[in-house]
Structures are given as structure tokens and as C-alpha cells.
């Protein structure tokens, strides 16, 4: 499990990005992966798992939960 902070989120589009605490590259998150909420806000602390998106070659967040 990783932890990080929401750096942007577009509720109208249902996606955004999380900056992981470990300093790695920002991670894409889709609204379908949110647990216990339907939206995120910039600055919120979250926990999440990362999965490599084979099609894009980048990591995305899954099982994202707000900590605050």
C-alpha cells in the first residue's frame, strides 16, 4: 500500500493524479477506483495500490481511500 496527496482531480471527467509520498512519478486515478467516496479534492491524503497499465506503460492507482 502507498500513501500520497491528490494534486489534481476533475470531477466532471472522473479522474485525477496523486503524488506518492515516496517521491515517484504522479499516479493516475479514475473515479471507479475510489472507495468510500465519489470525488477527491486537491490536497487530500489518500492510500492506494499501484498497478502497471500494460497498454500505457504507466502506473495507475487502485483501491484509493481518503485518509483525512
Give residue ranges: language-model regions:
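Structural detector for short beta-strands of small beta-barrel domains
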Residues: 1-11
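Conserved positions in beta-strands of structured domains
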Residues: 7, 19, 62-65
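OB-fold/S1-family single-stranded nucleic acid-binding modules
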Residues: 51-68
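Short nucleic-acid-contacting surface segments enriched for D/E, G, S/T with interspersed K/R
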Residues: 34-47
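A short macromolecule-binding patch
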Residues: 25-32
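Short aromatic-glycine-enriched beta-strand elements
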Residues: 13-18
